[in-house]
Structures are given as structure tokens and as C-alpha cells.
């Protein structure tokens, strides 16, 4: 499949979604976006770290394009995925792979049972959006892999995506990679909300970080996953140092009165812990702290009825 062009639909056109749309379009793929409020096209304006710009009108919400798509990529918040995807499944060919790119875990369970090949992915690319302009501020790695047996034959997609937006790596055990990203999210996201700080200032709270990691390691071991606390701690601190000047996505959501992904990050961890009879007191406390912040938003409850 390397060098092959594909017909692709990308559901969710935020900063990361537009980054993928621009990269795949430049590579010659036949792309379209898919928006909650349907429109025929979308102006995509992406600026990369080298100063290059992409400015094109990309078609959107064409049902015929969706029905003949060879790949569907979902770049939404975790809590938006099932609302967005489930109504569309009947228009996506059953042999078309669907790649989920989002923070957190638990969306797969909401989509079950599903016949389509499902791929999960996590990315370390950093991008933000202001006034509909996307700024790709840091290159990263996107890790993808099969979630169900139907998706195992689709490993060549990693090469196609790598050509568009490197680096992309295929993993035979993507769940381990997803758990690794979950650990970072469980530490960095809620703690930055609690202390209203940039990521780098979390080095002042080593005891809390250690307790969170201890609780997560216990859950991972109960799930049958290998853990090494010292290695995971080093991994977490490397992220804190490398993103020291950044505000976490969860803190940005709270500051902008938006719903967070806490239910699919710390909430998912707590749910798995309960299934194994484990307690997670520090993660419980942080979960309720973020949920209480959400409930303070004037418009939060009115937004709950909205689909993605």
C-alpha cells in the first residue's frame, strides 16, 4: 500500500484533524472533512514549524464520499466519539478501517458490537488553533494498531500515514501503548487543573505523582500488563520537562468552560480498578475535583444534550 492514494473521510476538524487533513491532501489523497453542523466545505489553514503554510478549501459532509471511503479517521474528544460515529456506521463500508485518534480510553466499549476494522492511535504531535488558523508547534510520533481481529491486516496503513505526517509506527499490542499514554494523562491533566499551572510546574508535586503512578500500576498489573514504576516515572517526568511551557488540554478545557475528557482518562482508570476490587484514592479525588469544576460552568448542563 506504500505510495498508494486513498479516499479518506476525517471526522472532527479541530487542530489535529485539520493537521491530518492538510497532510493527507498534500500527499495526494482524496480527502473530506466531516462536521457536526454539516457544510459543503471547510477552509483549512495550517502553519507548520518550518514556516510552510497550507491554505485550501476542503470538501465536507459528502455522503457519497463517506460511502466509498477506504479509511475513516476520527479526531474528536473521547466523549464525542460514539455520538458522532454510531449514526454514520451504516454509511461506512464494513471493510473500511476506522482509526480512532483521541486521548483516554473507553470509547471502544461504547462502540461495541462493531463489525468494522477498528484501529486505535495516540499521537504526540502538538497543534493549537486560534481564529481558525492551526499552528503545528511540535512534530511527534503517532502510534497505531489493531483493536479487533478485523483490523490486523491493515498494518500497511501505518506506511501511508507516515508518508503524509511522520512519524507513524504500527504496534501489534496497541493497548499497552494506549495505557502508557493514559498514565501520562492521568498525572498531567488533572494535576494541572488542580494547581492551574503549566505542565513544568508539576515537578513541585512528586508525592502526588508517585501516588497516582502507584495506583495506575496496580490496575495495569490486574489487567495483565507489565509495569515498571521507575521506568514509568522517568517517562512521566520526561513529558513534564519536554512540555514544560505547555498548558494541558484539560486545563485549557476548564479555562474555556468546555467539557473535559476526565471520564475517559481518570474515570476509565477508576472503572477498571473497581472491576478488580482495587481502590484509587488519589485518582478518585482528582476525578471529583475536575467533575466539580465542570459542574460550575454556567452552560455545562445545557451542553450535555448536544451531540458531538
Q: What role is predicted for each listed range?
A:
Residues 8, 31, 98, 118, ...:
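Hydrophobic anchor at the start of a short beta-strand
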Residues 101-177:
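Rossmann-fold dinucleotide-binding core
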Residues 2-57:
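NAD(P)+-binding Rossmann beta1-loop-alpha1 motif at the extreme N-terminus of oxidoreductases
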Residues 175-217:
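Active-site-proximal catalytic alpha-helix in oxidoreductases
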Amino acid at each position: 500500500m506504500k505510495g498508494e492514494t486513498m479516499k479518506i473521510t476525517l471526522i472532527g476538524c479541530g487542530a489535529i484533524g485539520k493537521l491530518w487533513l492538510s497532510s493527507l491532501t498534500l500527499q495526494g489523497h482524496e480527502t473530506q472533512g466531516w462536521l457536526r453542523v454539516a457544510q459543503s466545505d471547510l477552509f483549512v489553514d495550517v502553519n507548520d514549524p518550518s514556516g510552510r503554510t497550507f491554505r485550501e478549501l476542503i470538501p465536507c459532509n459528502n455522503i457519497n464520499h463517506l460511502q466509498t471511503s477506504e479509511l475513516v479517521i476520527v479526531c474528536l474528544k473521547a466523549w464525542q466519539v460514539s455520538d458522532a460515529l454510531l449514526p454514520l456506521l451504516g454509511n461506512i463500508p464494513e471493510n473500511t478501517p476506522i482509526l480512532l485518534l483521541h486521548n483516554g480510553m473507553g470509547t471502544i466499549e461504547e462502540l461495541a458490537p462493531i463489525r468494522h476494522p477498528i484501529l486505535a492511535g495516540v499521537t504526540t504531535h502538538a497543534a493549537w488553533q486560534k481564529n481558525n488558523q492551526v499552528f503545528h508547534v511540535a512534530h511527534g510520533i503517532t502510534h497505531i494498531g489493531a483493536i479487533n481481529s478485523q483490523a490486523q491486516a491493515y498494518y500497511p496503513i501505518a506506511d501511508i500515514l507516515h508518508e503524509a505526517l511522520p512519524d507513524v509506527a504500527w504496534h501489534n499490542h496497541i493497548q499497552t501503548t494506549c495505557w502508557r499514554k493514559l498514565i501520562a494523562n492521568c498525572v498531567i491533566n488533572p494535576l494541572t487543573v488542580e494547581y492551574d499551572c503549566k505542565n513544568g510546574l508539576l515537578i513541585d508535586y512528586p508525592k502526588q505523582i508517585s501516588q497516582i503512578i502507584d495506583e495506575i500500576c496496580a490496575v495495569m498489573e490486574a489487567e495483565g500488563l507489565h509495569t515498571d514504576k521507575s521506568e514509568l516515572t522517568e517517562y512521566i517526568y520526561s513529558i513534564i520537562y519536554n512540555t514544560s511551557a505547555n498548558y494541558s488540554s484539560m486545563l485549557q478545557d476548564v479555562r474555556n468552560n468546555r467539557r473535559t475528557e476526565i471520564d475517559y482518562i481518570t474515570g476509565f482508570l477508576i472503572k477498571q480498578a473497581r472491576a478488580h476490587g482495587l481502590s484509587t484514592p488519589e485518582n478518585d479525588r482528582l476525578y471529583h475535583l475536575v467533575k466539580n469544576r465542570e459542574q460550575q460552568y454556567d452552560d455545562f448542563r445545557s451542553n450535555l444534550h448536544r451531540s458531538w
